[in-house]
Amino acid sequence: MVTFVSMSKKGVLLVNLGTPDSPSVKDVRKYLREFLMDKYVIDLPYLTRWFLVNVIIATFRAPKSAIIYKQLWTKEGSPLLIYGLKVQKLLQKKLGVDIHVAFAMRYQNPPINKAIKELKNKGIDDLVVIPLYPQWASSSTKSSIEKVKEELKKQHYSPKVRLVETFVKNEKFIAAIAENGNKHWKTGKYDKVLFSYHGVPERHVIKDCESNYGNNHCKLDGNCCKTYTDKNRLCYRAQCYETSRLVAKAMNLKETDYEVAFQSRLETRARDPWLKPYSDIVTADFPKNGVKNVLAFSPSFIADCLETTVEVGDEFKEIFEENGGENWQLVESLNDSPLWIEALEQLSLNND
């Protein structure tokens, strides 16, 4: 008697945040509206959020943002999309034909619903979802995961799903960041390293900790993030500090060699502060404290984008030099580096 064993068909879904379809004001406004209307990004009541986003932010910010996106845009298009598609192809090659790799953006294109349809049509019944945000946050990771769940339900598609919520402890991910940094740090030209992470409202961090752990472990006082434990594993701030410690260790940095700060704040209310210290203020203060040469990382971004190339690479450099700084160097993001692809291979195969 012959017994046939049914083999599961495996797939991986990579999800990044998103990018406008073009640097035109129209497309930038469309992107901002979809992004900022997400209840996980701006968690205000719907009507308040709608007015804030559609009447104020998208109206006045889109023309300014379009100018910045034009600086970033290449002949191929948006770097975030270009690298996303490259990584998809490289990971597909790494994993081989037995595991199908799909790629989507949480906002705009390629959309999550299209990727889910692709996986369903391929007959994938064992799916790994990897949101491409190293540090878990409700405004990025949770939002993407919930969107994937929503689309799976809409399409009546029920594969076995494994979610990769965070990968700050993945050794190859850390090694990839350190490898890029050491190209510059080992030249001996720099006095200080800045690890600049995307900011989020303090309120989000506290609320997420209470939601995830049912306690008020998060004090935002510097002490609760000194160690990374089960009690703060999904605390965004704790993950940022843990990432910094691990990269510093991989680069043989002393604690006094680096600073951690938070960028890209969008304070919608005076009493709604974002995570501190603020990267732009830390940058301005460096020269005043005798720091003239800085090596800057953006470890919350796995591909170069507006926040890395323009904000950290150009705007912070200008702030630094205006205040007496001499040498500002942005470390490139992981983009499509071999170690980053190896990290994704591990995460896909659950060998983290």
Regions found by a protein language model. Give the residues of each.
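Active-site-proximal alpha-helix that buttresses catalytic centers in soluble enzyme cores
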Residues: 4-352
